[in-house]
C-alpha cells in the first residue's frame, strides 16, 4: 500500500523541508488538541468538589482561547505547506510527462491512444497529487493523532480502560487491508476504461464531420453509450469497495464506544475512575473517530494514487526509439545527402517498406519523388527526419552518418510540410510565426507571398488575425496547405520537404508556388513528393517509387524518354488538364 510513497521518494527528498514543517506543525496541533478534553474533565471534577470559582472559569476560558488561536495559526501553515506541496508535485509530474511525450517517436503514438495519454496527464496525476496531500495528512494524522490520543488516555486516565476500548482495532485493520488490495485492482481497471472513453470522445469530436457525412450519429452514440456503461460498471465496482469502508469503521467505532462506556462506568462504580475522567475518556474516544475513518480513507487514497502513479510511470519509462548520439559530429550545415542501400520495415509491417534505396542529392538540388499511394515516398522522408530507428544501409550528410547528427540540429535544418496539415487553434499569423517566432511583419508578408496566399488572406474576416479553429477547421484544404507552406518557408530551412503539400490547390496556384520556391531557394535543397507530376518537371532528379523500390530515376526529359510509368502518368495528367481547360472555356 505504502509503496507509492517509496516511488515518490525523489519528490519528498527534494522538498523535505516543506513536508517537515507541515508534519511538525501537524503533530504540534495534535498535541495541543489533547489539552481541552483533560481541562474539561478537571473542570467537571472541580464543580463536583465545589471548588469551581469565577477566577477558575476565567482561567479555563483563557486557556481554551489561547489553545484555539494556536491551533488555528499552526493549522493554516501546515495546510499551506502540505497541500502546496501536492500541487507542486502535480505540476512537476505534468511538466515531466509533457516533456517526455514531446520526445517520443511515432511508434510510441502508434501503441498509445491520445485519449488515454490525456487521462494519464489529468485524472491520474490528480489521484497522485491527492496522495501527496490528503494522503500524507491522513497518514500522519491518523497514526500520530491516534497514537497521541492512545498515550494520553493511558497515562492520564486508565491503561486498563484504554486497552479494553481498542480491542476492535485489529479487526478493522485486517478488513481495511483486504479492501485496499481490491481498490488498487479495480481502480486501475476503471482508469483504463476512462482512458479508452476519453479517446473515443476525442475521435468523435474531431471526426464529427465524417460521422455526419456518413449518417453514423446513431451508431457513434451507441458505441459511446456502451463505453460509458463500461466505465460506469467499473467505477461502481470501485464504489462498492469504497462503500464498505465507512460501515466497517462505524461498526467497530461503535463497539469501542460500547466497551468504553460500559467498562468505564464499571470502573467509576468501583471508584477506580472519577466521573470527570470518564467524561474526558469518552471525549478522547470521540476524537479517535476521525483517525479511524482516516485510516479507511488512507488505504483508499494510497491505493488509488499507487494505481495512477503506475500508469504515469509506465508512460515515463517508455524509452524513445530514436536517440541523440553520445558523441555527436560537428557538422554546421548539411551538404550532399546520400542514401546508400537503405532498407526499412515499419514495426507493424510484415514486409520491407523500402528496399535497397540508393541516390545522391547535391546541395541546392531539387528532388522530386513520385509514385502510387503506398509506394514508399513518405517513408523515405521519415528516414531523413529520423522518425524511426534506422534500418539497413546508411544515410549521410556531407559524409557524416545521420545517426551522428544531433536530432535538434538535423530537424532544425529541415522545413517539413507533411501530408496532414496540422494548424494550431490560433490566428493565421501565429501559425505562420511558428516557423520563426521572432520574424518581422515584412518576413511574414514575404512567406505569405511565396505561398501564394495573399488573395485568400484578404478574403478572411480578420486577415492575419483570423482564428483558424481547431486543427484549421475554419479553413479550406488549400488554405491550410498554403499556411503550412508559409510556416515552413518562414524558417528559411536548408532543406525544404513538401510531402504532397500541393494536392488541394489548382494547377495555376501550384505553378506559382513552385516558381516562387525555385526563385527564392537557390542554393538550398528541396524535396517535393507529389502525385501531380507537373510539380516536379523542373527537378534535378526525379525518383519514381513502386512497392518500396526505385522503379525509375532521372530528369523529366529522361523519364519521358523511358516510356515507363512516369511518361504514361504524365501524358494522362496533361490530357486531363487540357480537358479541364477546354471545359472551362
Curated annotation (Swiss-Prot):
It is found in: Cell membrane. Keywords: Antibiotic resistance, ATP-binding, Cell membrane, Membrane, Nucleotide-binding, Translocase, Transmembrane, Transmembrane helix, Transport. It holds the Pfam family ABC_tran. It is an enzyme of class 7 (translocase). It is a multi-pass membrane protein. One of its GO terms (biological process) is transmembrane transport. GO terms for molecular function: ABC-type transporter activity; ATP binding; ATP hydrolysis activity; ATPase-coupled transmembrane transporter activity. Gene3D superfamilies: ABC transporter type 1, transmembrane domain (1.20.1560.10), P-loop containing nucleotide triphosphate hydrolases (3.40.50.300). ATP binds at residues 371-378. Heterodimer composed of YheH and YheI. This is Probable multidrug resistance ABC transporter ATP-binding/permease protein YheI. The gene is yheI.
Amino acid at each position: 500500500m505504502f509503496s507509492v510513497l517509496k516511488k515518490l521518494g525523489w519528490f519528498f527528498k527534494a522538498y523535505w523541508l516543506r513536508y517537515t514543517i507541515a508534519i511538525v506543525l501537524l503533530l504540534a496541533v495534535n498535541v495541543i488538541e489533547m489539552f481541552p478534553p483533560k481541562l474539561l474533565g478537571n473542570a467537571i471534577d472541580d464543580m463536583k468538589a465545589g471548588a469551581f470559582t469565577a477566577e477558575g472559569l476565567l482561567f479555563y476560558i483563557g486557556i481554551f482561547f489561547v489553545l484555539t488561536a494556536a491551533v488555528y495559526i499552526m493549522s493554516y501553515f501546515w495546510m499551506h505547506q502540505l497541500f502546496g506541496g501536492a500541487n507542486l508535485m502535480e505540476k512537476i509530474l505534468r511538466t515531466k510527462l509533457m516533456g517526455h511525450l514531446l520526445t517520443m517517436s511515432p511508434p510510441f503514438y502508434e501503441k498509445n491512444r491520445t485519449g488515454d495519454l490525456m487521462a494519464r496527464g489529468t485524472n491520474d496525476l490528480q489521484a497522485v497529487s491527492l496522495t501527496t496531500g490528503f494522503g500524507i495528512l491522513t497518514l500522519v494524522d491518523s497514526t500520530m493523532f491516534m497514537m497521541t490520543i492512545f498515550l494520553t488516555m493511558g497515562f492520564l486516565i486508565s491503561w486498563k480502560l484504554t486497552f479494553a476500548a481498542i480491542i476492535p482495532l485489529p479487526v478493522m485493520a485486517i478488513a481495511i487491508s483486504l479492501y485496499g488490495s481490491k481498490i488498487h485492482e479495480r481502480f486501475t481497471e476503471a482508469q483504463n476504461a476512462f482512458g479508452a472513453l476519453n479517446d473515443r470522445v476525442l475521435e468523435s469530436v474531431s471526426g464529427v464531420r465524417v460521422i455526419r457525412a456518413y449518417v453514423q450519429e446513431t451508431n457513434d452514440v451507441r458505441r459511446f453509450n456502451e463505453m460509458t456503461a463500461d466505465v460506469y460498471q467499473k467505477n461502481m465496482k470501485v464504489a462498492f469497495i469504497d462503500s464498505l469502508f465507512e460501515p466497517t469503521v462505524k461498526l467497530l467505532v461503535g463497539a469501542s464506544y460500547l466497551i468504553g462506556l460500559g467498562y468505564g462506568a464499571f470502573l467509576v462504580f468501583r471508584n477506580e475512575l472519577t466521573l470527570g475522567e470518564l467524561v474526558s475518556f469518552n471525549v478522547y474516544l470521540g476524537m479517535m473517530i476521525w483517525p479511524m475513518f482516516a485510516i479507511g480513507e488512507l488505504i483508499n487514497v494510497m491505493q488509488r494514487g499507487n494505481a495512477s502513479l503506475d500508469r504515469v510511470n509506465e508512460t515515463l519509462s517508455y524509452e524513445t526509439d530514436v536517440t541523440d548520439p553520445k558523441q555527436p559530429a560537428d557538422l554546421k550545415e548539411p551538404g550532399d545527402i546520400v542514401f546508400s542501400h537503405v532498407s526499412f520495415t515499419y514495426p507493424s509491417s510484415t514486409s520491407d517498406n523500402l528496399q535497397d534505396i540508393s541516390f545522391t542529392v547535391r546541395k541546392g538540388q531539387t528532388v522530386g519523388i513520385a509514385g502510387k499511394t503506398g509506394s514508399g515516398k513518405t517513408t523515405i522522408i521519415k528516414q531523413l527526419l529520423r522518425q524511426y530507428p534506422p534500418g539497413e544501409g546508411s544515410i549521410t550528410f556531407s559524409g557524416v552518418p545521420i545517426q551522428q547528427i544531433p536530432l535538434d540540429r538535423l530537424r532544425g535544418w529541415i522545413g517539413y510540410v507533411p501530408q496532414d496539415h496540422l494548424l494550431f487553434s490560433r490566428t493565421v499569423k501565429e501559425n505562420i510565426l511558428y516557423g520563426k517566432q521572432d520574424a518581422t511583419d515584412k518576413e511574414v508578408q514575404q512567406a505569405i507571398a511565396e505561398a501564394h496566399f495573399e488573395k485568400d488572406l484578404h478574403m478572411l474576416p480578420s486577415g492575419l488575425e483570423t482564428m483558424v479553429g481547431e486543427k484549421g477547421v475554419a479553413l479550406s484544404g488549400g488554405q491550410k496547405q498554403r499556411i503550412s507552406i508559409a510556416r515552413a518557408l518562414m524558417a528559411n530551412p536548408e532543406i525544404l520537404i513538401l510531402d504532397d503539400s500541393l494536392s488541394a490547390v489548382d494547377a495555376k496556384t501550384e505553378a506559382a508556388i513552385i516558381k516562387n520556391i525555385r526563385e527564392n531557394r537557390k542554393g538550398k535543397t528541396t524535396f517535393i513528393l507529389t502525385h501531380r507530376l507537373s510539380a516536379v518537371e523542373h527537378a534535378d532528379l526525379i525518383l519514381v517509387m513502386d512497392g518500396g523500390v526505385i522503379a525509375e530515376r532521372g530528369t523529366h526529359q529522361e523519364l519521358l524518354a523511358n516510356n515507363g510509368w512516369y511518361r504514361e502518368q504524365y501524358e494522362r495528367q496533361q490530357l486531363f488538364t487540357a480537358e479541364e481547360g477546354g471545359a472551362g472555356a
